Amino acid sequence: MKIEVKDSTMIKPSAETPGGSLWLSNLDLLSPANYHTLSVHFYSHDGSDNFFDAAGLKESLSRALVEFYPYAGRLKLNGNRLEIDCNNEGLLLVEAECDGALDELGDFAPRPELNLIPKVDYSRGISTYPLMVFQLTRFKCGGVALGVANEHHLSDGVAALHFINTWAHLSRGAPAPTPLPHFDRSSLSARNPPQPQFSHAEYQPPPTLENPLPHTDIAHSRFKLTRDQLNSLKSKFKTAPADGGAGKSYSTFEVLAGHIWRSVCIARGLPEGQETKLHIPFDGRGRLQLPPGFFGNAIFFATPIATCGEIESNSLNYAVRRVSDGVSRLDEDYLRSSIDFLELQEDISKLAQGAHSFRCPNLWVISWVWLPIYEPDFGWGKAVYMGPWAAPFEGKSYLLPNPEKDGSLFVSITLHKQHMERFEKLFYEI
C-alpha cells in the first residue's frame, strides 16, 4: 500500500490563550529525548457524504486547543531543565490518501513502514517541532485512520486521550467533557528537602544477558483471550488466607502479567541464574489523589525482579504473586519517595526507559484496557480498532481491550522470532 500526503496544516487555538511557561515535573522529565508515542485509531465508513470532513475537524480541533493550549506550544530549556513554552505556534494536522483498504491491514498489527503518522523532524532542535501531530488518512474503501504522535514530556496516555476525546465531542456538536484539564503540576513537586525512603529498583539499570543472543529477527504477534479463558485463568489464583480469612483474589491484570512473564521466560530458554526484570507502568493519579483532570505524566513503575530459574521452576502462582506484591508496594509513601529520589538525580533524562529497558532478558507489560481508547467519536461512530503503531521493540507487550466489549482482550507482544512460537504454545496452556 502507498500513502500520498495531500495537505499539512498547523492548527492554532481559535481564541486567545495564556502565554508563559509550563513547569514540568520530575515524572515528565523521565520521558526519552526526541520521542513521540505513536498510536492509530481506525474508523469504518458509515455511509455519510461528509465522513471525517477535514474542514470541520480542523475547526473543532482549533476550539479544543483553547482549553488544551499547551499542545500548541513547544519545548524549551530553562537553564538545564525542560519546560513548555506556551507560544501558540500550533500542532500539525496532515491529510493523506492510501491506495489500499482497511481490511488489507488484517489484525492491525503495527506496520511502521506504512506511514500513517507523520515523521517528526528532531534535527533542528526541541523548539522547532510540534508536541502533538495528527494524520488523517483516507483509504480507498472510505475508511480512515487517525494517526497520533504525542510528545511524552507534556502528557501521558490518560491526558492525551482527554484532549482527543474533547476534540471528538466538539466535532460532533457535543459540549466539552468535564473535568477541564488541570495543568498545574505542583502536586507532583518533590518535598523540600527530598526524603526518599526506598532504593527504587525501577530506576536502576536493568539486568543484562549473561550470554548475549546472536542477532536475530523479531516477530510481532497479537493473541486473543476470551472472557471464558480469562475467567478460567483468574479463578486458579487467590492470595494466601490471612488470619483465618478467605484470601483475596488477584486482579485480571496481575494474573495475566504473571502468566506472560513466566511464558516469556520459558520461551527464551535462558540460564536459571539469569535475572529478569518486569516493567509495569502504573497510573498514580488515584493513590496520590491528584486534582480531577490532572494533565501531565503521572506514571510510576512496579519492577519485580527474579531469576529465570525462580520464575520457571515455581508454579505460575509465584510469578503472579511477585507482580501483585510489586503493584501493591506502590502506595502514597512509595510514590512520594519516587519523586524525591528523582529530585536528587543530576540528570533525570538518563533514567528514561526505552528499548534497552525491556529487551531480553527483561519484559514490559502495559495495560491499555482501562484507558478510554474507544471513546473518541467524532460524529461518525467509534473506532473499529485503536492500538500502538510504533516500531515494535523486543520485549514490549500491551494488553488491549476488544472494541466489541465482549469481555475479551488482546495481548500484543514483540519477541525474537525463535521465541514467539514457543511463547504462543505456553500462552494458551491455561
Swiss-Prot record:
Which Pfam families does the record associate with it?
Answer: Transferase
MF (Gene Ontology) = rosmarinate synthase activity
The record ties this protein, via Gene3D superfamilies, to: Chloramphenicol acetyltransferase-like domain (3.30.559.10)
The active site annotation covers H152, D377
Q: What class of enzyme is it?
A: transferase
Per the record, pH dependence is:
Optimum pH is 7.8.
Reactions performed catalytically: (2R)-3-(3,4-dihydroxyphenyl)lactate + (E)-caffeoyl-CoA = (R)-rosmarinate + CoA
EC number(s) on file = 2.3.1.140
UniProt keywords (A-Z) are: Acyltransferase, Transferase
Q: Which cysteines are joined by disulfide bonds?
A: none
Signal sequence extent: none
Ranges for the region named Disordered are 178-210
Q: What does this protein do?
A: Involved in the biosynthesis of rosmarinic acid, a compound with antiviral, antimicrobial and anti-inflammatory activities. Can use 4-coumaroyl- and caffeoyl-CoA as hydroxycinnamoyl donors and 4-Hydroxyphenyllactate and 3.4-Dihydroxyphenyllactate, but not shikimate or quinate, as hydroxycinnamoyl acceptors. Can also putatively catalyze amide formation with D-amino acids as acceptors.
Similarity comment: family membership: Belongs to the plant acyltransferase family.
**Which PANTHER family does the protein's record reference?**
SHIKIMATE O-HYDROXYCINNAMOYLTRANSFERASE (PTHR31642:SF11), TRICHOTHECENE 3-O-ACETYLTRANSFERASE (PTHR31642)
Protein name, UniProt field: Rosmarinate synthase
